Amino acid sequence: VLDIGCGRGKIIANLSSKLNLHYKPIGLDIENHKDKSKKIIFKNTDALSFISKTKLNFDLILIKQTIHLLKKKEIKTLLSNCKSKLNVNGKIIILSLDPEKNEIPTFFLMKKKLHKSLKRDKSYFDLIKKNYPKIIIKQFIFKVKISKIKYIQMIKKRYISTLLSFNEKQIADGLIEIKNKYKKELKFKDRLICLIIRN
C-alpha cells in the first residue's frame, strides 16, 4: 500500500492494523512531521519523484487531499505513473473534500483559501473523469464532534494543507476568530469525494 500525502501516517497506520497487512505501508509527504507513525515506512519526498524511481508495485495507492497541490499536467503524469505501478486488480483511490458541500469550521482567511482550493479541485476532478471514463465515484459523510480546544490544536499544527502557507500571525489571528465564532463543542459533517481508478 502506498499513501501519497500521508501527513503523519496515522490514517494509513490504523488501516494497516485493521486489515492486518503483510507489509508496512509506505507513506509519502513533502512535510517531515515530527510525530510520524512508527507503523509506516515514511519517505520525505514528492510523489512524482518516488513513483518514477520505485521498482515496487502496489495493490492500493491512496491519494488523500493532495491532488490540489499539483498542476494539471502533474496530475496526468502522476496518475498515469501510478496506474503503471498497480498490481493486477490494484486500485488508485483519490480522496478529497467535497468541493460543493463543505462544512469545515474555518476562520475568514482559511475559508477564502479553502474555497479557492476546492474550486480548483472541482476542475481537477473533471479532468480525471475525462481521462478515466470508467472511474467509480463515491461520496462519504462523516459526522464530526470535536472540542474547540482540540480543534484549535489541530489548526496550530496546520492539520489541513490549506493552512501550510499561513504565517504565525495569520494562524494566531485565525485562532482568535475560531475562539469567538464557535461554541465549546464543534459539530459538523465532513464530506468526502472518493474517485476510484481500477487497473
Give names to the regions the model predicted.
Residues 2, 7-50:
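Class I SAM-dependent methyltransferase SAM/SAH-binding core
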Residues 62:
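A conserved beta-strand element that flanks and buttresses the S-adenosyl-L-methionine
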Residues 65-66:
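Short catalytic micro-motifs in class I SAM-dependent methyltransferases
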